[in-house]
Curated annotation (Swiss-Prot):
Keywords: Disulfide bond. It comes from Bos taurus (Bovine). Disulfide bonds join C34-C37, C40-C45. This is Posterior pituitary peptide.
Amino acid sequence: RGEVKDASGELEPPPGPFIQRGRASCWLGRTGSCQNCWLCSQGNCAGV
């Protein structure tokens, strides 16, 4: 679903369902909580 770079500029594969809101790109873990977040407000997946 397109390439998303993390804070280090490396391309990271999504470990779970991919959620994108505006410029925020987050991945959800199996538990439904945010497992890995990049470019998210305060490092959190608010609104997910």
